[in-house]
């Protein structure tokens, strides 16, 4: 590399080298953590103080975003956090997935952790877990106890029932509630309903027979016979 001699500010000669400009442009990342160097391009970073290690994922909790990898050389369990995974979107590891990484001491002093985790080839993306947790904001269908429909609204703000009175959410009637709704009973317990209806019909028929003229005459005839028998018994005594 050539060196140029130029006149300095005080009239003296100064030695200039293009390497001087390069050294001025490179950021000083000595003593910075991994998170603090995330904004610095990878080609400007200093080489890692540790060699690249290889291992496989032991387990990974996709809901909490952390897990452990087993190092191939030592068999040691190394903590791994989702923020240190080289992948886009939802970051996770699949059980048994092959990975490469660097090792450093954890900031809380509880063992070692793997960082800059990628595929077996450094910089290669990870496959990730096949399991994704449900989003907290995902719409959940609930049973509205006013209109009876499965929807995202609750009974208090039901848009389908305009009245303030209690209604049956099975058939929509205002005359009864769902617990005694005949439609619900017929739908969910057909055998029991059929037995109850048969018993009710039998009782109604007995009541009708008791009130019919034929039944009254039959009862009157039995009373007459009973009185005659009682009279004959008294006369015989």
Curated annotation (Swiss-Prot):
PROSITE patterns reported for this sequence: CSD_2, ZF_CCHC
Listed GO MF terms: enzyme binding; mRNA 3'-UTR binding; mRNA binding; mRNA CDS binding; pre-miRNA binding; primary miRNA binding; zinc ion binding
Residues engaged in binding Zn(2+) 2: 168, 171, 176, 181
Chain spans, region Disordered: 1-26, 180-237
GO CC terms, sorted: cytoplasm; nucleus
Bias kind Basic and acidic residues: ranges: 17-26, 204-237
Subcellular localization, as worded in the UniProt entry: Cytoplasm
Family annotation (InterPro entries): CSD, CSP_DNA-bd, Lin-28_RNA-binding, NA-bd_OB-fold, Znf_CCHC, Znf_CCHC_sf
UniProt name for this protein: Protein lin-28
Originating species: Caenorhabditis briggsae
Species lineage: Eukaryota, Metazoa, Ecdysozoa, Nematoda, Chromadorea
